[in-house]
């Protein structure tokens, strides 16, 4: 297959002072052994080893008090040209002013994690938050499905996610983990909708024939390669996508061109 730009649309990194402690806690809670140390330097090293050109860092403000610190780190990570760092806002934070700061700082996307941030994706109380994000033109990526490190209830189960689709039509919205981590049968109700889906969390858990079917039933141009690094070895994710029985053009799109088009539409200039 001809080599084109490879973009990992879903990774995580933490400030050096917090990375070791954070990774230990997350690994203990989830039962997953990480493939990296959670630092920016570790992410860049992994990218070089795997041939990944760009990575999106999905930062998460897990409570209102940490929102500013999370976003200052997000801005600093963008000093590395290989990284495209997204910000995050908590529903209970002063998100209007924080979104303005992020916009002025060149951040082009926002990550929300309903489980960590303790809101149901279809709760009308968060509609103003969605509107504030989208009216500023941000790309919006959600964790969807289960999170084994958090437990029940699942705040962004596919049936709940489907309820918010009308407000996202025509917007740049990504549902991570193919629409529902560990809930892929239920996530079929999202296929064909006007959203992007990313492939993070799928290689070792979602059968190749199943994800191939989902990709073809959705819109292959709205599928984004993603690894959730450091929770997945990017080499595993790359091999998984490259092995799927899809046309080379479709694979090139998934591995980078789809993300490149989306990111460039928000000024990334890739």
Name these PLM-found stretches.
Residues 36-37, 61-65, 91-93, 105-187:
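Divalent metal-binding pocket/active-site signature
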Residues 44-51, 71-82, 98-107, 127-136, ...:
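Acidic (Asp/Glu)-rich catalytic clusters
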Residues 167-172, 179-237, 243-249:
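Active-site-adjacent C-terminal substructures of enzyme catalytic domains
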Residues 17-22, 68-70, 98-99, 153-154, ...:
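Short aromatic-enriched loop/helix-cap "lid" or pocket-rim segments at secondary-structure transitions
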Residues 2-12, 18-54, 217-222, 235-270:
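Mid-to-C-terminal alpha-helical segments outside catalytic/metal-binding sites
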Residues 7-11, 55-57, 84-87, 108-112, ...:
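Hydrophobic faces of well-ordered beta-strands that scaffold small-molecule active sites
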């Amino acid at each position: 297959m001809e080599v084109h730009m490879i973009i990992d649309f879903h990774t995580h990194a933490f400030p050096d002072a917090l990375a070791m402690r954070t990774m230990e806690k997350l690994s203990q809670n989830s039962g997953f052994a990480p493939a990296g140390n959670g630092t920016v330097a570790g992410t860049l090293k992994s990218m070089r080893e795997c041939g990944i050109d760009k990575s999106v860092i999905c930062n998460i403000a897990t409570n209102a008090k940490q929102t500013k610190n999370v976003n200052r780190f997000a801005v600093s990570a963008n000093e590395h040209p290989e990284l495209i760092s997204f910000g995050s806002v908590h529903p209970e934070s002063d998100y209007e002013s924080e979104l303005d700061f992020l916009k002025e700082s060149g951040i082009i996307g926002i990550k929300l994690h309903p489980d960590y941030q303790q809101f149901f994706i279809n709760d009308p109380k968060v509609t103003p938050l969605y509107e504030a994000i989208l009216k500023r033109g941000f790309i919006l990526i959600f964790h969807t499905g289960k999170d084994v490190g958090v437990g029940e209830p699942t705040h962004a189960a596919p049936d709940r996610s489907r309820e918010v689709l009308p407000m996202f039509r025509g917007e740049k919205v990504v549902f991570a983990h193919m629409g529902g981590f560990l809930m892929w049968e239920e996530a079929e109700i999202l296929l064909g909708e006007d959203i992007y889906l990313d492939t993070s969390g799928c290689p070792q858990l979602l059968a190749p024939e199943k994800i191939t079917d989902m990709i073809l039933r959705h819109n292959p141009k709205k599928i984004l390669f993603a690894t959730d690094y450091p929770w997945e070895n990017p080499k595993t994710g790359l091999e998984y996508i490259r092995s799927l029985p899809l046309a080379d053009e479709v694979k090139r799109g998934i591995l980078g061109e789809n993300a490149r088009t989306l990111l460039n539409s928000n000024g990334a200039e890739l």
